[in-house]
Structure formats: structure tokens, C-alpha cells
């Protein structure tokens, strides 16, 4: 591998947990479904989940930088009516169980 290839931009995965106001699930569901796969430059959405417990929804996404990850959460998710808190976690794969 050349030095140029080894310095290529690495894509980081993130999990954004979303807490909403009581009785606001329907209002958040629609904007989540309307996001495109690339809601902003440098961010690619993978999956969205409804979860149980302290958090209500989770969005799994990739970003080419921490800055773009912060912009996506701050400029897109947090501005959705009913969102009261977010918690974004960068992820590092330790094992991919889908691969032998």
C-alpha cells in the first residue's frame, strides 16, 4: 500500500441516541424517514431504530470527520421539533460477526 493510500480519509461510525418529549414519537418519526442517505456533505446514514429505555430513537451513521458528525446531529437532528436531548458515540469495531 502506498503512503498516499494509507493516509486516505478514514470514515468513522457513530451512534446518535435521541430523547424526545413525551407523546412526540410521531413527530420525530416523519423527519427521520425524510432524511436522505446523505443529509449533509460527509455524512452517510445507515440505519434508524426505535429503542427502549432512557432514549427513544437511535441513528447509526458514518461521517468523514467529527466536525461533520457534530453538524449533522446539531443542525439536523437537534432541530427536529420534540427532540430534547442527544448523545452521540463514536464507534470502533472490535469484531464483525457477519464475517468469518
State what each model feature region is.
Residues 1-100:
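A compositional/biophysical signature of low hydrophobicity enriched in polar/charged and small residues
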Amino acid at each position: 500500500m502506498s503512503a498516499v493510500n494509507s493516509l486516505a480519509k478514514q470514515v468513522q461510525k457513530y451512534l446518535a441516541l435521541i430523547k424526545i418529549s413525551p407523546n412526540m414519537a410521531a413527530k420525530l418519526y416523519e423527519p427521520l424517514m425524510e432524511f436522505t442517505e446523505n443529509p449533509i456533505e460527509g455524512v452517510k446514514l445507515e440505519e434508524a431504530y426505535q429503542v427502549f429505555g432512557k432514549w427513544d430513537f437511535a441513528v447509526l451513521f458514518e461521517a468523514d470527520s467529527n466536525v461533520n458528525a457534530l453538524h449533522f446531529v446539531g443542525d439536523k437532528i437537534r432541530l427536529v421539533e420534540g427532540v430534547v436531548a442527544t448523545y452521540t458515540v463514536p464507534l470502533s469495531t472490535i469484531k464483525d460477526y457477519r464475517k468469518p
